[in-house]
């Protein structure tokens, strides 16, 4: 039997923790941040709102899982404007999380991986003209599901801010619907 936590622990992340499922509260204000265009992905891809579904859909989907894991990648920056350091940390996180999602989907086909930032599988998304090329591989972000990432981290026992001149990318993976995957019972990661 596979252990999803073990996969995450050995997946190249800096921090891994059990996800506090009660912290998964979709918030309208997070969706409003998406709609404001801060990341320029709202209404531009299948993995982001409005294409990824309503907050009600997100709440129902997340409530159907019993367990989850949080994974973080932390990067040290030269200064607050170290764009190369931010990009390198983001790429390291996205690569590690894509690998974790791939492995988890093999073990738990109906798991829900929620990444940091928008899906980047395709150079250009087909939204809204054509169907998604890879609907089974597509990754929505925690924010697309209305989650306030800092709150989810804190309620799950992880820091969100690691001090000056650092950047942290956080993703989560929800799993274990009723008898849907092969995961061992929760265990202490400390």
Spell out what each predicted region is.
Residues 14-45, 49-190:
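Catalytic cores of enzyme domains
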């Amino acid at each position: 039997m596979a252990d999803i936590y073990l996969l995450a622990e050995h997946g190249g992340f800096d921090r891994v923790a059990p996800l506090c499922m009660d912290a998964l509260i979709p918030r309208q204000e997070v969706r409003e941040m998406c709609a404001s265009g801060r990341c320029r992905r709202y209404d531009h891809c299948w993995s982001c709102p409005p294409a990824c579904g309503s907050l009600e859909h997100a709440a129902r989907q997340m409530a159907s899982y019993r367990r989850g894991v949080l994974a973080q990648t932390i990067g040290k920056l030269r200064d607050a404007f170290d764009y190369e350091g931010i990009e390198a940390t983001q790429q390291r996180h996205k690569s590690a999380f894509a690998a974790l999602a791939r492995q988890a989907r093999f073990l738990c086909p109906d798991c829900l991986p929620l990444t940091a930032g928008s899906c980047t599988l395709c150079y250009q998304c087909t939204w809204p003209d054509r169907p998604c090329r890879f609907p089974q591989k597509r990754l929505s972000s925690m924010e697309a599901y209305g989650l306030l990432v800092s709150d989810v981290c804190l309620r799950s026992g992880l820091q969100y801010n690691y001090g000056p001149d650092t950047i942290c990318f956080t993703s989560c993976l929800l799993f274990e619907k009723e008898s849907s995957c092969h995961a061992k019972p929760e265990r202490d990661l400390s």
